[in-house]
Regions:
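A short alpha-helical cap/connector motif
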Residues: 1-117, 124-137
């Protein structure tokens, strides 16, 4: 896939990238991953989505771009400093809720069958606590 083919980048992504680079944060999603996230989110109308690893909000911006008005996104990260960037750019969107806490703790305290899609971009849910994450689907 040629990155130049990604023409409809969410408006917030450019500003998030500027803030991300200014902070020296180097773990944001690539544009191709973002475009794929938007497609996945669009496949779940009215969906309840979970992102583990908010970072500066790059992935969340793409998920929100693909979501319909009835969908919701919970996004979790332990680092309040990077989540603040995401909140500044995405916090006015009523569909998103930010959780500054350990992802493993979030997974363990959330009821089973609570989400329709999980994007695990952090240690919990990807490399540890996989069974906890899968139980939420």
């Amino acid at each position: 896939m040629n990155d130049s083919e990604i023409r409809r980048q969410p408006a917030t992504v450019a500003d998030i990238v500027v803030d991300t680079e200014a902070r020296g944060f180097n773990m944001a999603s690539e544009p191709r991953v973002g475009a794929f996230l938007a497609v996945l989110a669009a496949s779940k109308p009215g969906g309840r989505l979970l992102e583990l690893g908010t970072g500066t909000g790059h992935g969340a911006a793409w998920l929100l771009a693909g979501m319909d008005p009835a969908s919701t996104l919970d996004t979790v990260d332990t680092d309040a400093n990077v989540v603040a960037v995401a909140q500044r750019h995405l916090g006015s969107d009523r569909r998103v809720r930010f959780h500054v806490m350990d992802g493993a703790q979030f997974l363990q305290q959330t009821p089973s069958n609570h989400f329709d899609l999980i994007y695990a971009d952090a240690w919990p849910g990807k490399f540890s606590h996989l069974d906890d994450a899968l139980s939420l689907l």
